[in-house]
Amino acid sequence: MQAAYERIEADMRGIWGDMAPAMLRKRLRDVHADLSTLSREDLQRIVELLRQKTLPSILGEDGAEVKAKQYLAWVDDSG
């Protein structure tokens, strides 16, 4: 799951720049997860929060939905 998390972070850096890691750490706390023990379910919940609360501010609702689907595909691909 670490690889998927890092891929999401890299993509988010393209949108929010240096704020991306802090935004993801906030979502980690929101789901009571730790990066060192991140599970698929944790990462799926993080992506859902990103879709609902973070991504729409820049991408709009439709863009947030598309980006969240991309992120979930990365989660699925990572094992």
Which residue ranges define each predicted feature?
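N-terminal acidic leader/helix
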Residues: M1-D30
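Residue-level marker of intrinsically disordered, low-complexity segments enriched
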Residues: E6, R13, Q44-R45, A73
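Acidic, low-complexity cytosolic segments
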Residues: W16, L24, L59-G60, L72
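Alpha-helix boundary/interfacial micro-motifs
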Residues: D34-L35, G79
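Long, compositionally biased, intrinsically disordered segments
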Residues: L28, E61-A64, D77-G79
